[in-house]
Amino acid sequence: MEVLMAERANLVFHNKAIDGTAMKRLISRLIDHFGMAYTSHILDQLKTLGFQQATATSISLGIDDLLTIPSKGWLVQDAEQQSLILEKHHHYGNVHAVEKLRQSIEIWYSTSEYLRQEMNPNFRMTDPYNPVHIMSFSGARGNVSQVHQLVGMRGLMSDPQGQMIDLPIQSNLREGLSLTEYIISCYGARKGVVDTAVRTSDAGYLTRRLVEVVQHIVVRRRDCGTIRGISVSPQNSTMPERILIQTLIGRVLADDIYMGSRCIATRNQDIGVGLVNRFITLRTQLISIRTPFTCRSASWICRLCYGRSPTHGGLVELGEAVGIIAGQSIGEPGTQLTLRTFHTGGVFTGGTAEHVRAPSNGKIQFNEDLVHPTRTRHGHPAFLCYIDLYVTIESDDILHNVNIPPKSFLLVQNDQYVESEQVIAEIRAGTSTLNFKERVRKHIYSDSEGEMHWSTDVYHAPEFTYGNVHLLPKTSHLWVLSGKPYRSSVVPFSLSKDQDQMNTHSLSFEQIYISNPSVTNDQVKDKLSDSFSKKEDRITDYSELNRIGHCNLIYPAKNLDLLAKKRRNRFIIPFQGSQERKKELMSLSGISIEIPINGIFRKNSIFAYFDDPRYRRKSSGITKYGTIEMHSIVKKEDLIEYRGVKEFRPKYQMKVDRFFFIPEEVHILAGSSSIMVRNNSIIGVDTWITLNTRSRIGGVVRVERKKKKIELTIFSGDIHFPGETDKISRHSGILIPPSRKNSKDSKNLKKWIYVQRITPTKKKYFVLVRPVVPYEITDGINLATLFPQDLLQERDNVQLRVVNYILYGNGKVTRGISDTSIQLVRTCLVLNWNQDKKGSSIEEARGSFVEVRTNGMIQDFLKVNLVKPAISYISKRNDPSSEKKEGSDHTNMNPFYSIYIYPKTKLQKSFNQNQGTVRTLLGINKECQFFLILSSSNCFRIGPFKGVKYPKELIKKDPLIPIRNSFGPLGTALQIANFFSFYYLITHNQILVTNYLQLDNLKQTFQPFKFQYYLMDENGRIYNPDPCSNIIFNPFKLNWYFLHYHFCEETSTKIDLGQFVCENVCITKKGTHLKSGQVLIVQFDSVVIRSAKPYLATPGATLHGHYGEIIYEGDTLVTFIYEKSRSGDITQGLPKVEQVLEVRSIDSISINLEKRIDSWNERITRILGSPWGFLIGAELTIAQSRISLVNKIQKVYRSQGVQIHNRHIEIIVRQITSKVLVSEDGMSNVFLPGELIGLFRAERTGRALEEAICYRATLLGITRASLNTQSFISEASFQETARVLAKAALRGRIDWLKGLKENVVLGGMIPVGTGFKGFVHHSSQHKDIPLKTKKQNLFEGEMGDILFYHRELFESCLSKN
């Protein structure tokens, strides 16, 4: 007893809480001290003590023990506030849907996480012995996330697809859930239960398929003698050391490893922990290891390529069924992992960024040169810092220094005042291995119907110019302008024209015309019978020509059948002249009317051209003009491209009335092709020039070598060998007209000839007389008659001039590319117009095509608008308003902030329902014409202010007058007596234009005063319609804002016509906002806005549909591709593994795929040197794809924290990639094209027959690979038994019973383990292949070096791990 006491005195007294590790240490020390039996006795006593104490404390769990966290209330409130602001920004078009979703998820996730962190301290402070606290934090029962759901908040749930439900559950289970929350909660929690049931079977099936693929792979040899390997570099910093060690341990080296001249490891040595650590410490360059990929045996594997057995740590035994082990090791974790979803009840887990908060109130300062402005993934403006940034916060007396790590977002501006705990920066969340990201497509759908417009800064990806898909190069808005679409197939609208007014509820079209006093009854019948071609003078009654200011409609005469081959800015009017029909030689030709891309014509610009078929040639040749001195009207060089507009500058006004064409035959051949004729030799017709082309004409051959091609020209004609006396110009040829006499034969020439001197050698020369085809240029078809002249003369003196010009210069050689005909002369229509009488010059015209449907036939019009240039008139000095205007005259402000509008808040709607405007648009399918019927019922108007000075008699009356059918711009006519008014009209050039309008009372008999206004639509058309007429501009949904009348005294109003306005950008003194939309009318005291909804789109997004296309509610507008983190559980992981193994691709092809392939090709040639670059390319492709497949599968399992050795996956991947597809050419006598054969078999056959074999590497899924094996018995026992057996019987297949499954089915001995011995003698003679081959075959050795020693290539593959 005393001894015990003495010992006890020596023992250390511990007074600590004991946890698992301390317990382990204690037990091990007890065992060391007392032995096993005594220790177990002590531990028993401990257990009893524990139970006693627990009984005495009487820990029980009651509902009162669930204490909620006090700070929860304001945290939730704060999050709701943030969500509200976010919703507003989305509505204004500042952030798009993906950013909104992403941010709302992060707001709620961080709130929930914050609560979770608060939980523990809260318990510790308020009630440290709380049973819930003791239980969950000691690890006895329950974990933090479950307690968090009880007392914190349940937070965000994920739906069965693993997507987020962005409505958070704010309550916890202690408080009880609301109905919505309960339903969402059940939705999420049910997922766990269902998944477990469903996925267990999936995982089982996956295992079965995997085992099926590799069941025959057994270790059958010690060494296959391969010299290949896969290189791994320990210096490669991208790969974590842990993964590197995992990759290397248990493998076998494929080559000796030297450190300088010292060999530190030899070939075929297996790598242990010690060796790996040596590699890492010595930082060896490249380690070449053997893997199942490099094994040379076709249907089994050798010990050295497999490496160590995972069970006993030595090299794997002969006869071990490594295939089945591999299949099970991949399939098994799937079954285990499915059960994990169960416990959290579908609560979403994801990552958020960490925040840096301000330590105190104060002014923040940092170095602005170190940061760059950017847009965060939530759409907020921020600064990005690339290096460590030091931020100082200066409060009353203290300076705080905050260090912000690199690659963080700074969310505040310099010198801004920040409050304590305000978020000033966001640290990018480090990508943790647990939640891997994936690319998701998100479609944005339209909420309203209308017309689609883009902001001005949307470009097309060049390859999609005429397609329906547009990529965005930079952030911009997409607008859906309101309006109600109708299809034109409905009867009542078949006669309406663009910009007509019509009654939306009327069933017959006549009512409109008759109810309109300006059209009489017989005109209606006239129009109904044939609305276009009756009498052209009558048409002026119609709204288009006399109502729209500055719009000339040029439309074709009636005899033309108008077939519009539409492109975006050109169409062709085909027609056949009567002379052509007789000949019927040429195909249908037409006039192409072409509009410049920006729609602007300058003076003298070509507006249509016609390719006359008489001036077409099939063959190549040279054009010459009548004499050498003459010039063409237009040289090709003088067609100056001016902003995409072809413009004429007539240089030589000499009229060319004839030109000559000298035919020749030209062949352009590849540089490598063999030519069968000599230079300057003379050949006959139909001679073979190359292996597969013959000459069409006879004559002299001229061969010229250009950069990469050979140009072979054949000149036809007679050959004369002249005497000494003849003097022929040494220069290029001479044209000899028919009248002249030839010096030699002195007989008259019937035709023009062209004499050319050819000198094959220095002394000899001969003369080639070549035939010439003369062309007279006549007036041809008078194009101007196609367009009625009187219409053009009527207004603004638009003229069309016909110009013929020769497309090729004098002596220029024309080349026809592969049988296309060459047009020699093109007839052009040049648009010109005279100056106005007043002398105001019109610089440019805008062209656009208008389509109008009448009587079921669509007609196309070309509309040419003359746009007056914007000139600012400065008013006279004595005008009191002009001094104030002077300063704001040319200011160019940011268009968003240049709007100052003073509307009154009261909204008055007093319009009746039945007015509307037709606006025609081209639909998606070109045949069906769409109309937008726009009713004026949606117009908003904000009434006049107090400041507006009206004439006295008007003040008594209400300024709003009920609508009569044809009044006013929006159906309102304000009766205001005659007075001066001026207003600003700002075109796109942002130069102020002040118009003084003086209205003459005598002209208006209908009402005392009419509004004047301008309206501009997207083509830049400016209207100045007459309110009495039957045309009303498009009242889409219009918002009419009244501005302040005396704006000269207060501020000048700047609004661009056609400008898009976002909601909430123009904040005025009075504090009212505009709605979002497009500005249509600027008036002296008001502005009209067509309401529109903006959608933000960021770069890389895909737009659907064309500009100006009609959008219905629910149509897809934009597709975003964005990355998001998956919620971490294997239910999403398993299908991923399956996708990779079954080779099903769901990824969208990345936009820069081609570039990547190109750079990869360049890299291969750079590494391998060009000679056999692509021979090895095929092999490398297979290697590369195998490695990336392994990486993909590993990524999924690693994200779940499951470790699978690479070699298991490699065995499977080797089977998937082991087959190739025989292509059509080559080996036709052995294999059928399209047959699947083994890669090794293909190579062996190729070697045996010494013939090249063409094949394509394929990826088979595991199911297909199981059905394409050597053994039909194994295939039949897997799937499709009847089909497989029937096929095998018909083909007479033989099963060699090499695998396990066949032997099991037939009850034989399986060839693995002990049964392997009976199998050995087959392969004994190949047992050891001498390794000298490596030294003998130098070339193969070098290839091995080149292939596998280049780090560049495989670094990229392995780094993805």
Swiss-Prot record:
What cofactor does this protein call for? Zn(2+)
Write the record's keywords in alphabetical order, separated by commas: Chloroplast, DNA-directed RNA polymerase, Metal-binding, Nucleotidyltransferase, Plastid, Transcription, Transferase, Zinc
In terms of domain of life, where is this protein from? Answer: Eukaryota
Give the EC number(s) under which this enzyme is classified.
Answer: 2.7.7.6
CDD domains referenced in this protein's UniProt entry, alphabetically: RNAP_beta'_C
Give the main EC class: transferase
Q: Which SUPFAM superfamilies match?
A: beta and beta-prime subunits of DNA dependent RNA-polymerase (SSF64484)
Instruction: Tell me where it resides.
Output: Plastid, Chloroplast
Per UniProt, Zn(2+) binds at 224, 295, 302, 305
Q: Sorted alphabetically, which Gene3D superfamilies does this protein's record hold?
A: 1.10.132.30, 1.10.150.390, 1.10.1790.20, RNA polymerase Rpb1, domain 3 (1.10.274.100)
The record's GO molecular-function terms, alphabetically, read: DNA binding; DNA-directed RNA polymerase activity; zinc ion binding
Q: Which InterPro entries match?
A: DNA-dir_RpoC2_beta_pp, RNA_pol_beta''_euk, RNA_pol_Rpb1_3_sf, RNA_pol_Rpb1_4, RNA_pol_Rpb1_5, Rpb1_funnel_sf
Q: Name one GO biological process term.
A: DNA-templated transcription
Return any one Pfam family short name.
RNA_pol_Rpb1_5
Q: How is the cofactor bound?
A: Binds 1 Zn(2+) ion per subunit.
Q: Name one GO cellular component term.
A: DNA-directed RNA polymerase complex
Under catalytic activity, the entry for this protein gives: RNA(n) + a ribonucleoside 5'-triphosphate = RNA(n+1) + diphosphate
Subunit composition and interactions: In plastids the minimal PEP RNA polymerase catalytic core is composed of four subunits: alpha, beta, beta', and beta''. When a (nuclear-encoded) sigma factor is associated with the core the holoenzyme is formed, which can initiate transcription.
Q: Which PANTHER family match?
A: DNA-DIRECTED RNA POLYMERASE SUBUNIT BETA
User: In UniProt terms, what function does this protein have?
Assistant: DNA-dependent RNA polymerase catalyzes the transcription of DNA into RNA using the four ribonucleoside triphosphates as substrates.
Tell me its family: Belongs to the RNA polymerase beta' chain family. RpoC2 subfamily.
The protein here is known as DNA-directed RNA polymerase subunit beta''
Organism name: Spinacia oleracea
Name the gene that codes for it.
Answer: rpoC2
